A protein has these predicted regions:
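Residues in the helix-turn-helix
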Residues: 18, 29, 58
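Short basic helix-loop element that most often maps to the first helix and adjoining turn
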Residues: 3-22
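Short, basic-rich loop-to-helix N-cap that marks the start of a DNA-contacting helix
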Residues: 37-47, 66
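Recognition helix of helix-turn-helix/homeodomain-like DNA-binding domains
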Residues: 25-38
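Short, charged recognition helix plus adjacent turn
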Residues: 50, 61-66
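DNA major-groove recognition helix of helix-turn-helix/homeodomain DNA-binding modules
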Residues: 43-58
Length: 66
């Protein structure tokens, strides 16, 4: 799964730590999501999308083979 979390954070000048605290996960989890090593749960994806006021499908896209 591809995501645009890093881009969304940069747009609002938010750190990984700030995002992690806002959605209730560790900074390491945000790092892993941004680097494609962890696929967030539906609930976590919705929390992140809501925080950035963007549709989930704008932040997360399926890749071939997903």
């Amino acid at each position: 799964m591809e995501n645009k979390i890093r881009v969304a954070r940069a747009e609002v000048r938010m750190t990984q730590q700030q995002l992690a605290e806002a959605v209730g996960v560790s900074r390491q989890t945000i790092h892993a999501i941004e680097n494609g090593r962890f696929v967030p749960s539906t609930v976590l994806a919705l929390k992140i999308a809501h925080l950035f006021a963007k549709p989930v499908e704008e932040l997360f896209q399926l890749e071939a083979g997903d």
